[in-house]
């Protein structure tokens, strides 16, 4: 949620920035008008209540049966009616104001490229050599099926499209990948490992910005209203919801490996085969809480934490800065890390690292007390470290051999019981 005081004091800047994120400036004008009406109503109610209190004191000092006393009583009754009608009108205004406020995305940072979609994203850097093959590389799903480690057909039989069974060395590889990631984040990068709930309530989904805008993208259990998490960002960011931290608790880093559940409502026809776009998948998530003045430095570190996983795995990648039209709802600035996929001959997203500033903290009421005693909102950041299934896909494609076998990256071999290849 945006800082209402900032919106109030910088209306043209806010309209310009939100317009780059496909928000009609007229909605900002409506918000500002309602905000003024709401504050005027609050002031009016306070004034009416003050008058009522003064009259009530006068009634207590007079004869209520006298003409003057009766007049005072009638004035109080009139004030009660005015207070009730003003509060009712204010409630209506406030409801619409809140409706707009929770649907405004975050304001993009000044250095975010302006553009309507992914075509306006900017490449920041590349790392690693793109592998060359003296044979036509196969897609990861072909390799997985021929090696007997991925079974999409039987998964479709029991759950439908966009599900998979991992088998034998495939299951071991998946487990090895996320175990390696968690060890790197916790043992080297300073993260605390969390195993969070995989079902959360609606308020928690609201806190990180998934609700109300993206309800169609998730799975909700109708009997309870609980939602299967689309990412561990949701429970990790809400860990400190409605709390005031001490300054010495910042920064705090959390990581978790969880299943993630997504309906992929807007993805019909895209990535219909393989591990790239699933309804259920594992992901290692990184979440940071920090002081406002440090959040952009923390974003650079967070992105490097994700990149380090790929460097250790020996996978080529590049980093792009997302444009205003491609940046996520809650984010002010996002880097996507994309890994090279040989069969398609393109880079594909494997991590998205975002600085949300105080946007999520305002929704989830996460604050900290400064040394001088004042209270401010923390800044929150999140990033994939990494999407596990996509990492498995990248390993299968980049480490495949001409005979259809797949070599295992050295850093994963200790997690694979010493296995050096899948055959």
Swiss-Prot record:
Catalytic activity: tRNA(Ser) + L-serine + ATP = L-seryl-tRNA(Ser) + AMP + diphosphate + H(+); tRNA(Sec) + L-serine + ATP = L-seryl-tRNA(Sec) + AMP + diphosphate + H(+)
Annotated binding of L-serine, by residue: 231-233, 285, 384
Pathway membership: Aminoacyl-tRNA biosynthesis; selenocysteinyl-tRNA(Sec) biosynthesis; L-seryl-tRNA(Sec) from L-serine and tRNA(Sec): step 1/1
Subcellular location: Cytoplasm
Documented EC number(s): 6.1.1.11
Molecular-function annotations in GO: ATP binding; catalytic activity, acting on a protein; serine-tRNA ligase activity; transferase activity
Keywords: Aminoacyl-tRNA synthetase, ATP-binding, Cytoplasm, Ligase, Nucleotide-binding, Protein biosynthesis
GO cellular component: cytoplasm
Classification via InterPro entries: aa-tRNA-synt_IIb (IPR002314), aa-tRNA-synth_II (IPR006195), aa-tRNA-synth_II/BPL/LPL (IPR045864), Ser-tRNA-ligase_type_1 (IPR002317), Ser-tRNA-synth_1_N (IPR015866), SerRS_1_N_sf (IPR042103), SerRS_core (IPR033729), tRNA-bd_arm (IPR010978)
GO terms under biological process: selenocysteine biosynthetic process; seryl-tRNA aminoacylation
Main localization, broad class: cytoplasm
Binding-site residues for ATP, renumbered to this chain: 262-264, 349-352
CDD domains, sorted: SerRS_core
Keyword flag Glycosyltransferase: no
Keyword Metal-binding: no
Role summary: Catalyzes the attachment of serine to tRNA(Ser). Is also able to aminoacylate tRNA(Sec) with serine, to form the misacylated tRNA L-seryl-tRNA(Sec), which will be further converted into selenocysteinyl-tRNA(Sec).
Subunit structure: Homodimer. The tRNA molecule binds across the dimer.
Domain topic, free-text comment: Consists of two distinct domains, a catalytic core and a N-terminal extension that is involved in tRNA binding.
Family statement: Belongs to the class-II aminoacyl-tRNA synthetase family. Type-1 seryl-tRNA synthetase subfamily.
NCBIfam families, A to Z: serS
Protein name: Serine--tRNA ligase 1
Species the sequence originates in: Lactiplantibacillus plantarum (strain ATCC BAA-793 / NCIMB 8826 / WCFS1) (Lactobacillus plantarum)
């Amino acid at each position: 949620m945006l800082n209402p005081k900032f919106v109030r004091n910088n209306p043209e800047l806010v309209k310009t920035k939100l317009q780059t994120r496909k928000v009609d400036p007229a909605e900002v004008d409506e918000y500002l008008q309602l905000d003024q009406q709401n504050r005027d109503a609050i002031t009016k109610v306070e004034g009416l209540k003050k008058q009522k209190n003064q009259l009530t004191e006068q009634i207590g000092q007079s004869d209520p049966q006298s003409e003057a006393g009766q007049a005072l009583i009638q004035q109080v009754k009139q004030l009660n009616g005015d207070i009730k009608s003003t509060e009712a009108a204010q409630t209506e205004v406030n409801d619409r104001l809140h409706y707009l406020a929770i649907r405004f995305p975050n304001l993009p940072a000044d250095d975010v490229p302006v553009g309507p979609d992914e075509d306006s994203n900017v490449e920041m850097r590349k790392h690693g050599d793109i592998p060359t093959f003296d044979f036509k590389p196969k897609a990861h799903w072909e390799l997985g099926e021929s090696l007997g480690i991925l079974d999409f057909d039987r998964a479709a039989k029991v759950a439908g499209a966009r599900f998979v069974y991992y088998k034998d060395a495939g299951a071991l590889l998946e487990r090895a990948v996320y175990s390696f990631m968690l060890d790197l984040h916790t043992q080297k990068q300073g993260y605390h490992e969390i195993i969070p709930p995989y079902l959360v309530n609606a308020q928690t989904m609201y806190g990180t910005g998934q609700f109300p805008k993206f309800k169609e993208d998730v799975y909700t259990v109708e009997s309870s209203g609980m939602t299967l998490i689309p990412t561990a960002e949701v429970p990790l960011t809400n860990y400190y919801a409605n709390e005031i931290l001490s300054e010495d608790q910042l920064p705090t880093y959390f990581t978790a490996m969880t299943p993630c559940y997504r309906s992929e409502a807007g993805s019909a026809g895209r990535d219909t085969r393989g591990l790239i776009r699933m309804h259920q998948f594992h992901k290692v998530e990184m979440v940071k809480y920090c002081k406002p003045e440090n959040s952009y430095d923390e974003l650079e570190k967070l992105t490097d934490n994700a990149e380090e996983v790929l460097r250790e795995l020996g996978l080529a990648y590049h980093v792009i800065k997302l444009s205003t039209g491609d940046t996520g709802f809650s984010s002010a600035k996002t880097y996507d890390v994309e890994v090279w996929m040989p069969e398609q001959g393109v880079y594909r997203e494997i991590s998205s690292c975002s600085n949300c500033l105080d946007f999520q903290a305002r929704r989830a009421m996460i604050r900290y007390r400064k040394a001088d005693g004042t209270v401010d909102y923390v800044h929150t950041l999140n990033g994939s470290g990494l999407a596990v299934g996509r990492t498995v896909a990248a390993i299968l494609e980049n480490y495949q051999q001409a005979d259809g076998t797949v070599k295992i990256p050295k850093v994963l071999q200790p997690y694979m019981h010493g296995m050096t290849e899948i055959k």
